[in-house]
């Protein structure tokens, strides 16, 4: 998912997406440990999506604090 698409979402939607991606990452790690993961690169992509969301949430938090 691109950062541009994520920036269009509200904070609540981003937090929901973050929770969803963390669950997905946990499942991917479990599948990888068991040995049944077809695309291990999916773990890396999911971690990057999580990082993008956290970055956008932090940027918004800082812009709100700076505006006060």
UniProtKB/Swiss-Prot annotation:
Family of the protein in this entry: Belongs to the universal ribosomal protein uL29 family.
Any Pfam family the entry gives: Ribosomal_L29
Any single GO BP term: translation
Matches recorded under Gene3D superfamilies: 1.10.287.310
GO CC field: cytosolic large ribosomal subunit
Keywords: Ribonucleoprotein, Ribosomal protein
MF terms in GO: structural constituent of ribosome
PROSITE patterns listed in its UniProt record: RIBOSOMAL_L29
NCBIfam families: L29
The UniProt record lists the keyword Zinc-finger: no
Organism expressing this protein natively: Persephonella marina (strain DSM 14350 / EX-H1)
Protein name, as recorded: Large ribosomal subunit protein uL29
Keyword set includes Acetylation: no
